[in-house]
Regions:
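Extended hydrophobic/aromatic segments used for targeting, binding, or gating
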Residues: 206-227, 231
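Short acidic/histidine-rich active-site segments
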Residues: 194-199, 203
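Conserved alpha/beta catalytic core and glycan-binding cleft of carbohydrate-active enzymes
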Residues: 30-195, 210, 245-248, 252
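Catalytic cores of secreted or luminal carbohydrate-active enzymes
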Residues: 228-249
Length: 261
């Protein structure tokens, strides 16, 4: 990793299923030797370190539990924002906390807003467009009888499953994507946008398209007017965020979300 940083000028690393790296004798140890090695390395300790802070094992969900020098994919941000914009009950208190930097997760050990990598979609799962267009996954093309991929997507199709010519449904979907982009880019923390979401890319409801090297997973850059409008909207949000320091504070705003009903 040090060699890659020095020779290729890569400024950071993202660790997949990073909780695995902290396991000692099957248990997750936040003081594991791996973290000691990273902290003591004169090169790696100075680069951006981003964790996917969970794995498949017992006790593997470690959002908020990594050392202060790390940033983390905030899975609780993703889940809360999805639930809020599909009008799930009792989500407002937690939504406010996520918008303000998730201090309930990161304030304990004095971490800053950059500890939270905020995201709504990623390379796994639904695209933003599919998140507002499908209630169910449609992975039949993967050849596993639609058994693969996450079944609990916290998505809402706005009234019709998949593509439709109904004007009101399509307008609502466009608004929902804007709602989520605005939330993401106006939140404290680091915003992460999955490439293609800014032009409403679809995978036709496939939320596990790793095996699809075809139109299902490709980005079509022949944009229609709705896609161009969404791209312009996202671009303006990014400029707004860059222009206003209050949207990327150096210190957390302290909140304590109420438990859900």
């Amino acid at each position: 990793a040090s060699d890659v940083y020095k020779r290729q000028h890569i400024d950071g690393f993202r660790f997949d299923l990073a909780a695995t790296l902290a396991r000692q004798f099957q248990e997750v140890d936040k003081l594991s030797a791996f973290f000691d090695i990273v902290e003591q390395d004169p090169v790696i300790s100075r680069v951006k370190l981003i964790a996917e802070p969970w794995d498949l094992g017992s006790g593997g969900y470690q959002v908020g539990g990594f050392p202060s020098s790390w940033s983390e994919w905030n899975g609780r941000y993703r889940d809360c924002v999805r639930d809020f914009w599909r009008s799930q009950p009792s989500t407002l208190p937690e939504f406010a906390s996520r918008l303000m930097g998730s201090s309930d997760l990161y304030q304990v050990n004095g971490r800053r807003p950059v500890a939270s990598v905020n995201f709504i979609t990623a390379h796994d799962g639904f695209t933003m467009n599919d998140l507002v267009s499908y209630n169910e996954k449609h992975n039949e093309a993967n050849g596993e009888g639609n058994r693969d991929g996450e079944s609990n997507n916290r998505s809402w199709n706005c009234g019709v499953e998949g593509p439709t010519t109904i004007k009101d449904v399509n307008e609502l979907r466009q608004q929902q994507m804007r709602n989520m982009f605005a939330t993401l880019l106006l939140s404290q923390g680091i915003p992460m946008i999955c490439g293609g979401d800014e032009v409403a890319r679809t995978q036709q409801g496939n939320n596990n398209a790793y095996c699809q090297d075809n139109a299902i997973s490709w980005t079509n850059w022949d944009l229609d007017e709705d896609q161009k409008d969404l791209l312009e909207f996202v671009s303006k949000l990014i400029h707004l965020r860059l222009e206003h320091p209050v949207l990327h504070r150096r210190c957390l705003l302290y909140t304590s979300p109420s438990p859900r009903d």
